[in-house]
Regions:
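Structural/interface elements that position substrates and couple domains in central-metabolism enzymes
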Residues: 1-388
Length: 388
């Protein structure tokens, strides 16, 4: 089959590479740099497995900035472009997705359009009506940044928001490229699939918020947070995973997906969803105040990325603490080797790690890394288990 993949971020790239094992795939992106990298079998994002796959596997894969030429004669067109959360409208900005749908329908009306971008509940029904077509389906992704291809090769489940032959075919294409056997396939209605994505990420955010609030309680009471978490997590109903305290949940998906789900509730009574959103801000305020109590003159921010093995700066939790410290007049220095500029939010960006270490009084690091072992006394982190 011929498949077009529009948007070559974590989701689009991992899907394009997986599907190119057994199909002709053309990736589309507005970034010429990303297109050139993919055509040269280089990954434009940090993902070790993806880089290895591109180097070692025989893939029927090419990339282009020309959308119309790329989707011509395609059987499926996957849209995986960003849907940023608009704080003014309290909804995802789906304008880019809608623009691509419009262009694909005009160029290749026979293609089945599969939305992989995260969308609000009811979006598929809305665009089917506005574009007067049923050729649009939704298949949510459940990928981790930095491990997107691995999560496609070993998926927890494949969900498609339609009970139809074309939905089964698409799910089969994803399963065909995966290494995992006996993958759970789930075919639902469109709104159910949209809700599955938002509720999944909101549950993960809730778990992060829960263990962060446990950690805040332990810090305030000067008791052993690690011992409490270990004791709680030994209950098999709770589990010893996704329980490492942090500066808050961050990254591209969890902050915006929780807010979108809250907006989707509208007039439906709820308490937990609002509490999850609010808890993330409360955690950052609490930790910022702890740091301020130390009366530092200069605070260092070690990496802006969301987590180890990621190159994503978007909505990383450490930025929330950084902004709160700056609002109190604290001088901040940022160490971020992936940042190609000299300042970040009016703070100096230091590219020399040695200079960075001796310049600041306290180093904030969401996750502890070996690079900071020689200055452990300076490091402020809530990483208790050495994992994400």
């Amino acid at each position: 089959m011929k498949i077009g993949v529009v948007g070559l971020g974590d989701v689009g790239l991992s899907n394009a590479v997986l599907l190119a094992l057994h199909n002709e795939v053309i990736g589309v992106d507005i970034s010429q740099e990303r297109v050139d990298a993919l055509n040269n079998r280089k990954s434009p994002i940090i993902d070790q497995e993806l880089s290895q796959f591109l180097a070692d596997k025989q893939l029927n894969l090419s990339a282009s900035t020309d959308l119309n030429a790329s989707v011509k004669d395609a059987d499926y067109v996957i849209i995986s472009t960003p849907t940023d959360y608009n704080e003014k409208t309290n909804f995802f900005d789906t304008s880019l997705v809608q623009d691509i749908i419009s262009k694909v329908i005009k160029t290749e009306p026979g293609a089945c359009i599969v939305i992989k971008s995260t969308i609000p509940v009811g979006f598929i029904d809305e665009v089917r009506h506005s574009f007067e077509t049923n050729a649009i389906i939704y298949s949510p992704e459940f990928l981790r940044e930095g491990k997107a291809l691995k999560d496609n090769l070993y998926p927890s489940r494949i969900v498609v928001g339609e009970k139809s032959e074309r939905a089964k075919v698409f799910a089969g294409l994803l399963a065909e490229g995966a290494n995992k056997q006996d993958i759970k396939l789930l075919f639902t209605g469109t709104r159910e699939a949209e809700a599955i994505k938002l509720f999944s990420n909101t549950y993960l955010a809730m778990r992060v918020a829960f263990f962060n609030e446990l950690d805040s309680y332990a810090l305030a009471g000067e008791i052993d947070s690690k011992a409490i978490i270990e004791g709680v997590s030994l209950d098999p109903r709770i589990g010893n995973h996704y329980n490492n305290p942090s500066f808050g949940y961050g990254g591209y998906c969890l902050p915006k997906d929780t807010k979108q789900l809250l907006a989707n509730y509208d007039t439906v009574p709820q308490n937990i969803i609002r509490a999850i959103v609010d808890a993330n801000s409360t955690r950052k305020e609490f930790l910022a105040n702890l740091i301020l109590e130390k009366k530092p003159s200069k605070v260092g921010i070690f990496r802006l990325v969301m987590k180890a093995g990621s190159d994503n700066f978007r909505q990383s939790s450490i930025q929330g603490i950084m902004k709160r410290l700056k609002a109190k007049g604290i001088e901040v220095v940022v160490y971020e080797p992936e940042l190609k500029k000299t300042t970040f939010f009016s703070s100096h960006v230091e590219t020399d790690l040695t200079i960075f270490k001796v310049t600041v009084d306290i180093i904030l690091s969401n996750r502890m890394v070996p690079d900071l072992d020689d200055v452990k006394a300076k490091v402020f982190t809530r990483d208790l288990f050495g994992q994400d």
